[in-house]
């Protein structure tokens, strides 16, 4: 392996490892739930409520059933809790092509630890891990990661500086030893402020190819 100071390659999940819906409307279409009154749904009072609920949910402070009910209320009654659950469960999709192979290649590199640091929640995490049903095997790429750090278990979320500090402790790595891929600039910027090596990924392009290129630049891959 080429000389590199990188000891940990850390991935965000949605938009980097796994395709996800990028809007409520897209998830509704996947779930077979009608889109109702977009102008009412988008009202600021409801949008702010939903944002606060997502923060509680993804940091482990709100159970799934309570989240469905609360989000349904924060749509102004446009959607039922059952419909919210269906839309939410449709949000995650398949791995980006080539990412599982990339992680497998990294796992063969001596001295390199693969990990994720993701804002997620119990339902999405169960789907991604294949814990819900034998018919839903989960993400092969995520199954290949040596360490998984997720917001609802940590009680913290990106871009809070505290989650990056918690990751450093969990991974037993200094900031410059971590190379972090995320599709949101606010998250890579916060990690960079702690001294992490960071790359913002374009989720609309080949994510595996982007990451391979940067891993070669950093001397992690030949």
Task: Report the location of each language-model feature.
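N-terminal helical cap/lid subdomain that shapes the substrate entry/recognition surface
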Residues: 3-101, 121-125
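Structured, non-catalytic alpha/beta "coupling" segments that mediate domain-domain communication
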Residues: 111-117, 121-122
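Short glycine/serine/threonine/alanine-rich loop segments
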Residues: 33, 77, 112, 173, ...
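A local structural micro-motif
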Residues: 36, 80, 114-115, 176, ...
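Asp-based, Mg2+/Mn2+-dependent phosphohydrolase catalytic module
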Residues: 2-9, 104, 121-222
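Catalytic-core regions built around general acid/base machinery
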Residues: 98-110
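Generic structural signal for small/hydrophobic residues in well-ordered secondary structure
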Residues: 12-15, 60, 106, 116, ...
């Amino acid at each position: 392996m080429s000389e590199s100071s990188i000891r940990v390659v850390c991935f965000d999940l949605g938009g980097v490892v796994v395709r996800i819906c990028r809007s409520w409307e897209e998830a509704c279409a996947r779930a077979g739930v009608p889109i109702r009154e977009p102008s009412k749904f988008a009202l600021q009072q409801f949008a702010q409520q939903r944002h606060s609920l997502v923060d509680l949910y993804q940091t482990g402070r709100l159970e799934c059933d309570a989240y469905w009910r609360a989000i349904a209320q924060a749509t102004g009654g446009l959607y039922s809790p059952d419909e919210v659950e269906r839309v939410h469960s449709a949000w995650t999709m398949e791995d980006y092509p080539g990412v599982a192979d990339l992680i497998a290649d990294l796992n063969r590199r001596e001295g390199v630890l693969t990990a994720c640091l993701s804002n997620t929640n119990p339902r999405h995490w169960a789907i991604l891990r294949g814990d819900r049903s034998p018919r839903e095997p989960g993400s092969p790429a995520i199954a290949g990661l040596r360490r998984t750090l997720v917001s609802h278990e940590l009680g913290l979320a990106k871009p809070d500086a505290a989650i990056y500090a918690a990751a450093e402790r969990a991974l037993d790595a200094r900031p410059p030893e971590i190379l972090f891929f995320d599709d949101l600039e606010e998250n890579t910027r916060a990690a960079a402020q702690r001294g992490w090596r960071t790359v913002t990924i374009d989720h609309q392009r080949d994510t595996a190819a982007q990451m391979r290129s940067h891993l070669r630049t950093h001397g992690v891959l030949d």
